Structures are given as structure tokens and as C-alpha cells.
Amino acid sequence: MRLLVIDGNSIANRAFYGIKLLTTKDGRYTNAIFGFLNILLSLLKESEPDEVAVAFDLKAPTFRHKMYDGYKATRHKMPDELAAQLPVIRQLLALLGYREVTAEGWEADDILGTLAAACAARSDDCFLATGDRDSLQLVSDTTTVLLATTALGRSKTVTMDVDAVKEKYGVTPRQLIDVKSLMGDTSDNIPGVKGIGEKSAFALIQKYGSLEGVYAHLDDTTDKTIKPKQREHLAEDRAMAELSYTLGTIRTDAPIDTAEGAYAVGEGNKAEAVRLMQELELHSLIARFGLSDITPAADPERAPAEPLPEAELAALPAEPKGHYLVAARPAVMGKQGVRIVELQPAAWYAVQGRTVFPLESEDLLRLLDNKDVTLDVFDSAPLYARAMAAGGWGSSIAWDGKLAAYLLDASASKYNLSELIISYRADAAFTCEKWPDAGALADLFAKMKTEITALEEDSLYNDIEFPLAQVLADMTRIGILVDKEGIEKFGVKMRSELEDVLTRIHMETGSASFNPNSPKQLGEMLFDTMGLPHGKKTQRGWSTDAETLEALRDYPLVEDILQYRAYQKLNSTYVEGLLKVIAEDGRIHTRFNQTEARTGRLSSDNPNLQNIPIRTELGSQLRAYFVARPGCVLVDADYSQIELRILAHVTGDEHMQQAFLTGEDIHRSTAAKIYGLPLEQVTPRLRSSAKAINFGIMYGKGAYSLSKDIGVSVKEADAFLKNYLATFPKVSGYMDKTISDARNCGYVSTLFGRRRSLPELASNNHNIRASGERMARNTPIQGTAADVIKLAMVRVWRRLRDEKMESRLILTVHDELIVEAPEAEAAKAAAILQEEMEGCVNYAVPLSTEVHQGKNWLEAH
């Protein structure tokens, strides 16, 4: 028999801190619940248990508190966000059939110990899942600890058996108790012996075997292992050491059920579990727990519905008229060998009244550009693509529920129709077995429209997000022409550069087998063999991340390693990556993502053209291979310092506004104000510092981050920041008010009314709260800039169409728009870009663009 025992409080704690704060649409925290259930699934897969017990601590004091008043006295209060989720975790575990174990006056650790001892007595295997290293003392031939850890921002489980404990700590599992009795434990406030730290404690136990062994040699002054001062402390604190041993020993006699079969997984209440998971918007977990076929229990807060009529299924009329709701049943994906393939394609359908019309491709085309039809759809992007591929525009599409869902909750990772129906509690007007979402479409869309109006986001939706979907579909359709032969030659050059750098690296390391892609080999070479400074140890060995290597760039080997990494990324990501996605027409048709970024910004993939490097000469050279077709040029318009101009507008700061209005260099002007210098005395270094502060303020950077950016001490950076805020008090006042308002209402807004919820601001955890404050500062500025460029895209696209020009908007990257224009239209296209981009808003500081043109993107930028 195999028993899995989970330390419920410990795993919940790991889950809470391992995942960023998640909330449901109505503001309930779910990150610990989501994380706990994910960890549970991993544990079940890893241990394959026959029985599962979940141990929880109770609030009442334990025998250890009675033994020592200071026990756990320094523990911080559990964050409210976690405390609210624990009862739900316990409820879900019960509904899924898992048995909870508690014992008044005892800790969860003792429950783990007692069940482990019971398994050992039966020669059964026991797996203890916990994030608490105290449980390692329980490891034995029959007991394995599955230790939940977090490293490099990722959670994982480390399997600790007897050999693993000995290898890591140099002592046996039981000797860990002796070690703790000497060094104490700050988290549990176990005192230990004054002056004995971790290193000394391990050394003493490794030498003498136990606490008793240490004291047996205490009077042997000829033994130099124990230093004189340590000997003195050991003698003085013997009672504390023995108390610490008792406090640190996990008991194995807790009054709980230890019988075989006591923790067999029961039936639970799967229907109620599914209902609760749906309520918590944990839809992905329903399938992972194998509950997809379970009908959820009725919502206790909603009155039982009358039996619903069945839908009528019909073929789409030859001449459809009126208003239809259009959506798709998602494609069914599955494994074919090791590949993920589409087992069943997405299937579109239309709803009118109580009639459902399955739609073939020709049916869709009869609806999408039909003057007698209007369509409310869910996910317009593929529909616009179909219409445009057939020579139309998708002009019948009047509203998109997916875009509405994004505006109403930008924090969601995806927008699934079935899940939204549950989240909005949309009522079905009829049932339809083949198209199960069809009956609730009308109520879902109505509720979304009502909510958008209530949140005053109608203008944002109607003027920006909805029309932008058509623009993006057209841009994807057109694509951008690339010089394939040029990219291939660039790739040959890259590979040659890579070989040259690798040869230098091998010469510098003295090893032809040295692999610069191996973090282990690189760390050992830099910090063990060469003894370079700034080394940081992680659980996996020496850190060799970009920040660590940048601090060592002055060393020739490190400079070559960084060069090697840069060339390698250029070659694999951009050269080889771009060559794979060139279509038959010689163009790259990147896909724009409208519903991903919480700030409202666009992203792109397949390929991601937002990240084409521009800071290095070789990186920027890639842009030369994005070209205009014969007889055309690329016209490139880029906003100049749009975020700083928005900052000047929203803060009302006269100094900042004046600098922009008079055409001064804003960073030079800022430096002059901060340092009290005439403009002509501002050095490049001071300007660079001011530039870093200007942007750092918006992104919520503190003195430490700023010091890294401008290469000064933290103290100097702190002085710069204080000087800046004193010089521009309205900026400081605006930031403070933004955070205060966000705390009060739970969100921030752009100037266009786009909302971003910030549950992080309510956290008791300082780091989480600080992250929320940074987002509160940044989102209104960055989000407004995103809204502005989206609006400009819509206006530019419409102008080019309305004026019947051949010029086409083909690409956007951050604050930049690119039009492919016939040479004869280039000047007019440039004028339209400038007029629409600068004229789409009326702010206290006018927006400014820089417009250039060329045969390729590098020339035009």
C-alpha cells in the first residue's frame, strides 16, 4: 500500500506565494486554490498512491506552545488573501473525496510523523508532501518526502529519500533534529544555543553524531573541534538545547486514525465540486481532474429553471435576413503519437430566435458581407480572415463578445465561451445537445453590453477595440514582404560569427569541450576555476543569468559569452525563425493579438515582430530584410516620447509641459531643472540620468533599480529621485493620488476608460503590494499610449480606404506604424500618418511623430 500525506497548510502557503494573485470576476482570490490543486495533481502523478490524507493545523495552541511560551511567537499573521482561500481548499478536497486529518493540540507535522510511523510498522510506502524541511527528519527506508520548493520563480517538487538527505546535508535524517537543537530555528522561534550557527551545528553533529555526543565531549579541552567560546555557550545553554531538541522532534503518536484503508479516496460530491470550480472560474482544472462529463450541481442561489424547450435545427436560408448570433464550437485537440493535432475542427453556428443553423464555409460567406444581415459574434478575428480571403470585409459583423470580455476583464489568460456563460450566469433560452452554448448566447451578450455601458466603456469599445479587429485582420492578410535571400546570407554571416566567438571562448577557457550553453559548466568556469567576483549560488548551482554576466562584462571571456548568446539568439530566433514563416507570396503574415496584454497593448506572434532587436548594429540590420514591393516604399511613423507627453498632460506639470511646447529636449530640460544648471551645462551623463529617471518614474522604479540603470550608488540614485520629485511636485502628487484612488476602488483607468483591476494593492504582503503600486503608476500612462496608437491605426486605415489609395497599413510595433505605399502616394501616405496620429487626441501637450520612408524598414525607421 502507498499512502500520500499532504501537509495542507504548507502546500497552500507554497501555492499562494508561488502564483501571482488571481481573482474571479467578482473579486474572490483564487491563486492559492488554483496552485494547491495543481500541486495535488502533480503529487498524485508522481506518487501514484492508494490512499491520500491531507493534514491541516488547527488554531488552538499545541503541546509545544505549552512547553515553551515563545514557540512560533515571531510568526507573521497569515495574509488575509490566503486565509480566505484555505476554507475553500478544504471544501474542494472534501468534495473530491479526499479525507482531512486534524488533531487538537497537535501540529500537521505530527500527523505526518504518525502516519509515516504507521506505514513503517506495516512496511508500506509513505510519501510526505510538504514545503517544510522539518519533515526531512522523518525520511526512512519506507518514508520519502516530496519537498515543494520554489526556485527562479518556478515551483517544483524535490524527492528526498535517505541518500538524498545525506548527500545534501552530510547527516542522517534523524540527525537533523540534533542540528536544529544547536542552531535553533528562527521561523518557529526555537532558541537553540547562542553563538552556534548553521555551519557550526552541522560540523558538530557530523563529528559527534548527536546532541548527547556533543555534550559528552564538552569537558574534553584537548578536543579542538569545539572552540572555547562555543564551549562556553554550550555549557550555558544546555537546557535550551535540550528544550530545542524536544520542540524540534516531530512526534509519531498523534491521536488519529492510522488503520490501513482509512484514507482511501471516497466518492465525495463531484457534481458540487464542478459547480464550485466553475464558480471560482477554475475551468481548466475540471478537465484535469477528469470531471468534464460531470453535470454541475444546481447553483443554490438560483431558483430551479423550468424545463427548457429544444432548439430547432435548420439549414441557413438561401437569402438570410435579420439579426444572428454567431459562435463556434471549439476545435477538439488531442495527441497523435507525440504530436498535438486537431482531432475535430472548430464548427461555426448561427442562432436566430430558437433556431440554430450549422454553418458550412459557404454559409458563413453568405452572412459575413450581407447588407440584409447584422451579426453579433464571439471572436471576429477568424471571421474577418475568412471574409477577406474571399474578397469581402466582414461588413455584417456588428459586435464581438470576445472583445467585450477582454474589456470587462483584461486579467484573464483566455476567453472561452463556455466559461464566460458560467461566469456571467447567462440563462439559456433553449437546449441544444450538439451546440450546448447556443441557448445562452443571447443572455450572455446582453449582460456584457449592459456591463460595458455601466462601466462607461462604450466609446472605448465602439471607437477603438471593435473597429481595430477588422484593421488587424487586414494587416495580417496583407503581411510584409521580406528579402529571403538576404536573410539567408545574414544567417551564414551569423553562423560564421558564432564559430569565431566559440573558437575564442575555447582558447580563453583552455578547453575545446567547454559548452557555453551549459549553465553548470559556465558557472564552474567563471566562479570556481577563474574565481570571478559577484557569483550568486542558487539551488541549481552558480547563477549565470544576464544580470550576473553584465556585471562581469569587462572580463574578455564574459564579453565573448554575451556576444555568443546574442549571436545565437539572432540566428535561432530571427534568422531561422523568420525563414520558417515566409509564405508562398514571399511575405510574413504575423498574427496580432488584441486580447492578451492587461495594459491594452497589442502583441504579435508567428512570428513576434515586436521584439525585432534594434539596439545592436547586427540586430537592427535585420530590419533591412523587411522590404517594400517593387515600385513602393515603406512609410514609417513613430510617436516621439508619447508616454512622457501623456505624463505631462495628466500631471499638469508646467515645467514638463513647457519643455515640450517649446521644443526643448525633455531629458536635457529635466536634468537642468533637477541640478539647477543652465541647459548648455547639462552633460551627456546628466542627460542620461534624467532620461532614466523620466521613464523610471512611470514604471515605478526605486533607487536600487535606478542605480543599476545609470551606474551610480543606491544613495546617489535615491538623491536623484528625491531631487526629481521635489522639482516636479505635480508628478509626485499625481502618482500618490493614482495609488490612493486605486486602493479605494480596486482599479486604475486610462484616459479612454480602460480599466485594470489591481487586487495586489489589498495584499498584506509587501512585495505583492509594491508590485501593485508599480502597476498603478504605470498602467494609466502606458495604457493610454496603447489606446492612442490603436485609435490612430483605425483612423489611418479608414483614411487610406476612404481616399481610395493603394497604400496599406501593414505593421505596428510599439509606438510605430508602417504603411506600404506606391512611390507616387508616399508623400500623401506620410501626411495621413502624421495628421491622424497627431490629431487623434487633443492633449495639453500635442503629440508628435517622426515620419520617414525607405525601400526597407531599416531605411524608413
Predicted regions, residues:
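Conserved RNase H-like, two-metal-ion catalytic cores of nucleic-acid enzymes
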Residues: 3-4, 8, 14-53, 69-70, ...
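Extended two-metal-dependent nuclease catalytic cores across DNA- and RNA-processing enzymes
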Residues: 22-23, 73-256
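Charged catalytic and DNA/RNA-contacting regions of genome-maintenance
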Residues: 126-129, 136-174, 344-347, 352, ...
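Conserved "right-hand" nucleotidyltransferase catalytic core of DNA-directed polymerases
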Residues: 237-359, 374, 434-437, 442-614, ...
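Function-dense linear segments that define catalytic or interfacial modules
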Residues: 353, 402-431, 438-441, 594-678
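Active-site palm subdomain of RNA-directed nucleic acid polymerases
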Residues: 452-464, 468, 788, 792-813, ...
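Conserved catalytic core of nucleic-acid polymerases
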Residues: 477, 589-590, 594-597, 672-805, ...
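C-terminal polymerase-core module
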Residues: 496-503, 507, 511-558, 726-774, ...
